[in-house]
Amino acid sequence: YQGGFIWDYVDQALMKADEDGVLHMAYGGDFDDRPTDYNFCGNGIVYADRTISPKAQEVKYLYQDLRLIPDACGVEIENRRLFTDTSDLEFIWLALRNGEPIHTERFCARVNPGEREYVSVPAPAFTEPGEYVYQVSAVKKRAELWADAGYETAFGESGRVIGAVGAGAV
């Protein structure tokens, strides 16, 4: 797995008070310095105050060693690991309708390294109009030196709309 390296782990910014005395993280031209690189130094996966940014979740997704593609009936599991099957994981499949959970299934699946398998889940037919989102997570069955039991190592999501859905319903 080469490529996609993290250049800046943390944003490079300083605390600064605005005209109302409210503190915020400032960088680039925020100090009236010219020339400036503007937000070039604000591209880390954690903010300058060390809180996690949304980019960290994207990095986790891109680096995960499984590809999970859920749908209304199950999930396709692609094991991108080189030597290990998926027997160390439990999978949690979740269906949401208009943002509300409506069905969950937990299961185990053994997919060998470099292989893919579709696993069906015993879910009801979803026919009511609405926006449906299908999510799946792979979590550790047992604690490891680097992760607690239940730690999510991979995730996937897909969705579809059934029938006409008004903007207020979604």
Give names to the regions the model predicted:
Residues 1-73, 81-87, 92-101:
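Extended substrate-binding grooves/exosites of carbohydrate-active enzymes
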